[in-house]
Amino acid sequence: MKFAVAIAFTLLVCVFAQEEEEPVTCGGKQCKPNSCCVQNSHGKGKDSPRCHPLGKLNNPCEVEPNENGIYSQHCPCGEGLSCTKVGEPNKLRCQEESGKSDKSKESQGSDESEESEGSKESSG
């Protein structure tokens, strides 16, 4: 029984892994990796869906697509960034994920202190 459950779980994981790797289909075309499908629904008439790159630092962004997997104006953020409310009137923008920038600053600070200690030892 445990063996059957383990096999079923493994198959389920494989199915989900395959779904994530499939490229996004947008307006009859497949989008490249690190892109999403956007269809501007504002203004006169609807634009046809188009592939857009994922958001970069400070780019406008969206968090959730519609029921068809299409975003209304902007892609979500790329890797290492999160879609965060910024400024007035709380527009969503891609920002560094919290903790990442702090960690990099901390590691830079520790490197600098090690270097300065090393230079003191060599001069003394």
UniProtKB/Swiss-Prot annotation:
Subcellular location: Secreted
Alphabetical list of Gene3D superfamilies matching this protein: Lipase, subunit A
Annotated S-S bridges: C26-C37, C31-C51, C36-C75, C61-C83, C77-C94
Secreted in keyword set: yes
Tissue occurrence: Expressed by the venom gland.
Gene Ontology, cellular component aspect: extracellular region
Chain intervals for the UniProt region annotation (Disordered): 93-124
Chief subcellular location: secreted
Leader sequence residues: 1-17
Alphabetized UniProt keyword annotations: Disulfide bond, Ion channel impairing toxin, Secreted, Signal, Toxin
GO MF entry, a single one: ion channel regulator activity
Domain of life: Eukaryota
Stretches with biased composition (Basic and acidic residues): 93-108
Membership in a protein family: Belongs to the neurotoxin 32 family.
Role summary: Probable ion channel inhibitor.
Protein name: U33-theraphotoxin-Cg1b
Source organism of the structure: Chilobrachys guangxiensis (Chinese earth tiger tarantula)
